[in-house]
A protein has these predicted regions:
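Divalent-metal (Mg2+/Mn2+/Ca2+)-assisted nucleotide/phosphate chemistry catalytic cores
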Residues: 82-201, 206
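Haloarchaeal acidic low-complexity proteome signature biased toward cell-envelope/secretome components but also
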Residues: 1-9, 337-343
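N-terminal catalytic cores of NTP/NDP-binding nucleotidyl/phosphoryl-transfer enzymes
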Residues: 11-77, 177-184, 190
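Short connector loops at secondary-structure junctions
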Residues: 69-82, 207-212
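Active-site beta-loop-alpha junctions enriched in small/polar residues
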Residues: 38, 71, 115-117, 209
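Short secondary-structure boundary/capping segments
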Residues: 50, 80-83, 222, 259
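Conserved nucleotide- and phosphate/pyrophosphate-binding catalytic cores
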Residues: 185-343
Length: 343
């Protein structure tokens, strides 16, 4: 694979690359990338779309580290209680491994690291104090505004959070920082301050945040707005069937976004097209080689919302089926990580 192909593979299905020139320059060597997940609530299909991208990194010859950011999960308004950090970290790692495997990646080639393995080291701690001394309160709050829970009287942990996330890039020796577009503020802070702390400004790749199935932003607290990794085929079908998906409209259409950012990348990796099966009386089977073709047909009215939903539900269930099987084979993971929900 030449440099142009690798660059295209890495930048596809992203919201933003900062910057493409820097990313291209990295490909002359052996770049490394990292993504971090704070083990808080249950993982869902929104996580799957970002984790699927790790298969692209691997195919492009980029070494990947996944940080299970256990300390971050507690620092952000104690979203995860201290006594549940280990259980939730174990659940997150198992889920991420299953998702990457389902997406065609190799979880055994990923380096999984937990925050407490290095974030309590003396060198890391001293560097964090130095960074805290040099960074203003307003700059820190601005960096974390899309990630950390905000209030009129914020906890100190939420202010330490973006400083640590910036330092994680250096500590993990990552050339590329990858995450959702909501992480942009933190990584822009990292690009500013890391050169003053013995590190390099990372290249940043940002994934889009998907709309919820009810329209608008996906909500972890709204059960019907997302598909869980353990949802059975009937639940997947029911949620997709009830999703906001008005004829011809693309904006805030979670069904189309799932198809674009999850289903199509997996199909492309397999060399398969998106197939919509319909009775002959309703026009017969449709085949779409690219997402752009599918979206155009939807906007023009050649693809009915219900036909799209039926096909999307099948492909999504196929994608999460091996993940669901692994997690249901280990019910202890969810019971121990979320005892209030599974007792």
């Amino acid at each position: 694979m030449n440099t142009a192909d690798r660059l295209d593979l890495l930048s596809r299905y992203t919201e933003e690359v900062v910057t493409e020139d820097e990313l291209e320059a990295l490909l002359d060597g052996e770049p490394t990338a990292y993504i971090g997940y704070a083990p808080t609530g249950e993982m869902h299909i929104g996580h799957f779309t970002t984790i699927r991208k790790l298969a692209d990194f691997q195919q492009a010859g980029v070494d990947v580290t996944v940080l299970i950011a256990d300390l971050h999960a507690h620092l952000d308004s104690e979203k995860s209680p201290w006594d549940l950090l280990d259980a939730r970290s174990e659940y997150y790692e198992a889920s991420i491994r299953a998702m990457l495997d389902s997406a065609g990646g190799d979880p055994n080639s990923v380096d999984f690291v937990r925050g407490r393995e290095f974030q309590l080291d003396e060198e890391y701690t001293l560097e964090m104090y130095r960074m805290a001394a040099e960074t203003t309160l307003s700059r820190t709050q601005r960096a974390a505004s899309e990630v950390v829970r905000q209030s009129d009287s914020p906890a100190l942990g939420g202010l330490i959070y973006p400083l640590m996330q910036s330092l994680d890039v250096k500590a993990l020796d990552a050339d590329i920082a990858y995450g959702g577009i909501d992480q942009r503020g933190i990584y822009m802070l990292g690009r500013e301050v890391l050169p003053d702390h013995g590190g390099d400004s990372p290249v940043c790749l940002f994934a889009p945040l998907l709309s919820g199935l009810s329209g608008g932003k996906m909500s972890a607290s709204e059960a019907g707005s997302k598909i869980n990794l353990t949802d059975d085929p009937g639940q997947v079908e029911e949620k997709i069937d009830g999703a906001y998906c008005p004829q011809g409209e693309v904006e805030d259409n979670g069904v189309l976004e799932y198809v674009r950012f999850l289903v199509y990348p997996i199909l492309e990796q397999r060399g398969e097209d998106f197939v919509v099966e319909r009775p002959e009386e309703y026009g017969g089977t449709l085949t779409f080689e690219s997402y752009d073709d599918l979206e155009a047909a939807y906007v023009e009215g050649d693809l009915h919302p219900q036909d799209l939903k039926n096909a999307a539900a099948g492909y999504i269930d196929e994608a999460i089926a091996p993940i669901r099987e692994r997690l249901t084979d280990r019910p202890d993971l969810l019971v121990e990580a979320y005892p209030e929900s599974y007792e």
